[in-house]
Amino acid sequence: QEYFTDNQDFPHRFKGPVYKPHKYEGNKDDESKLTRQEQIDQLSQDNLYDILRRQMVKRLESSFGAFQKSMENLFNSYQHIKAFIQNSGGRYILDRQLINKANVDDPDSIEDILNQFSQNNLDGDGRRNKIYDVNKFVLKEQFFADIDSDISLFEKILKEIKNLKLVENDPKLRTLLKNVHSIL
């Protein structure tokens, strides 16, 4: 659970940069200067990050197998997103489904995805409808460092799960099976 804390003092915590890119843009530090839409977008991104963080703790509490699967999904998603950003010239969107459709090794595929995203969001003014240019982020290096930090965290957690054989020896699953057998 300490990996998914919101305590900023814990250095090896989940940072979630791909869920809240507004934190790295650095355009407006003073919230009073934000437009209403920008305030809504920032709150939305922060809430998405918080929901994911809490959901990961719940997955851990439910079963080690569910938690492992979620960690694998996050790990794969982050690697895909990082490759997408690197191979798109620094562009990023908050649409995970579209990013996952892209062949991240093919710049034409990425360009097609970005064009599709633009067409789908012609009338959208929110950040969810925005193509971020990571190269213009004030905190660009921190954005990539936090992505790498999260990837390392996921790798560490997956390694711990494997080394401790938590999925194979899940005490919650054993208790559930024992109770089911006693009922039957």
Per-region residue spans from a language model:
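Helicase motor interdomain insertion/brace
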Residues: 1-184
